[in-house]
């Protein structure tokens, strides 16, 4: 039996996490569910994120024998994990900014945290900084616009640098910044452009590989759901069908999801 793994995000940023996981578990059965009806999650209230996460996982668990769920969104992960772990019997893996490895890697101990506005203000993230980077200077930029720029890149293949530059302008001439944490699953898709605009930064870190390692460990040490399924191809779902649906379906096909379905909550 192939394990069934669900990943969910507000948009397609979670595909960066999926990409890392499938390198280690190429034969797993993947479900990807993006909440485009509530995109982006960046500044949504905690109660909205928890309610939608619960409903999305419940819908999928009702229809598919889930072995593991990945919350492939930093913003959601800062608030939804305790509730999901209380409700569901299977492992729930979250996505947190790579603060610990960044603190170990940075030579100047000046680190940039590039995330959504919601993520950089959450107590959970502030506690990670206190725990793992107490001796580091953490420069924070919270951006909803960059999430939207990445979604556009998935459709057009390019990011408008004239729109990206103002977002990270404060870091461009920073004398000691040597490490940037990509604290949103969308942002690895903008890594090339960020490297171009921030040539003095040595390290750009995201959590994708660490999540993949954690998922692999849990799958290898968990009994897989023995319920038989007729449909074993990877499937993608969204929460609303809008004027971007056909383009989004093509994008999901490129990432290994032959079919995009609408599953409202």
Swiss-Prot record:
GO BP field: cell wall organization; peptidoglycan biosynthetic process; regulation of cell shape
Main enzyme class: isomerase
Pfam families xrefs: Asp_Glu_race
Catalytic activity annotation: L-glutamate = D-glutamate
Active site feature: 73, 184
InterPro entries: Asp/Glu/hydantoin_racemase (IPR015942), Asp/Glu_race (IPR001920), Asp/Glu_racemase_AS_1 (IPR018187), Glu_race (IPR004391)
Pathway annotation: Cell wall biogenesis; peptidoglycan biosynthesis
Keywords: Cell shape, Cell wall biogenesis/degradation, Isomerase, Peptidoglycan synthesis
Binding site for substrate: 9-10, 41-42, 74-75, 185-186
NCBIfam families xrefs: glut_race
Sequence similarity: Belongs to the aspartate/glutamate racemases family.
Record HAMAP family: Glu_racemase (MF_00258)
PANTHER family, A to Z: GLUTAMATE RACEMASE
Task performed by this protein: Provides the (R)-glutamate required for cell wall biosynthesis.
Protein's recorded name: Glutamate racemase
Species this chain originates from: Haemophilus ducreyi (strain 35000HP / ATCC 700724)
């Amino acid at each position: 039996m192939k394990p069934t793994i669900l990943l969910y995000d507000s948009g397609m940023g979670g595909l960066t996490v999926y990409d890392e996981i499938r390198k280690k578990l190429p034969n797993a059965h993947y479900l990807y569910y993006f909440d485009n009806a509530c995109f982006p999650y960046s500044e949504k209230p905690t109660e909205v994120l928890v309610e939608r996460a619960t409903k999305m996982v419940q819908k999928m668990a009702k229809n598919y024998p889930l072995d593991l769920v990945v919350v492939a969104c930093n913003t959601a992960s800062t608030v939804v994990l305790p509730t999901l772990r209380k409700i569901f019997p299977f492992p729930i893996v979250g996505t947190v900014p790579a603060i610990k490895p960044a603190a170990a890697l940075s030579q100047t101990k000046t680190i940039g945290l590039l995330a959504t506005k919601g993520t950089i203000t959450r107590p959970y993230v502030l506690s990670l900084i206190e725990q793992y980077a107490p001796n580091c200077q953490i420069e924070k930029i919270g951006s909803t616009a960059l999430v939207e720029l990445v979604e556009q890149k998935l459709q057009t293949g390019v990011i408008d640098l004239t729109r990206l530059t103002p977002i990270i302008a404060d870091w461009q001439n920073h004398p000691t910044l040597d490490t940037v944490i990509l604290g949103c699953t969308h942002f690895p898709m903008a890594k090339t452009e960020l490297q171009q605009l921030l040539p003095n930064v040595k390290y750009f870190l995201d959590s994708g590989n660490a999540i993949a390692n954690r998922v692999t460990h849990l799958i290898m040490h968990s009994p897989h759901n023995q319920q038989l399924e007729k449909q074993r191809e990877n499937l993608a779902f969204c929460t609303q069908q809008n004027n971007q649906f056909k383009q989004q379906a093509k994008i999901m096909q490129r990432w290994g999801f032959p079919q995009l379905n609408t599953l409202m909550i």
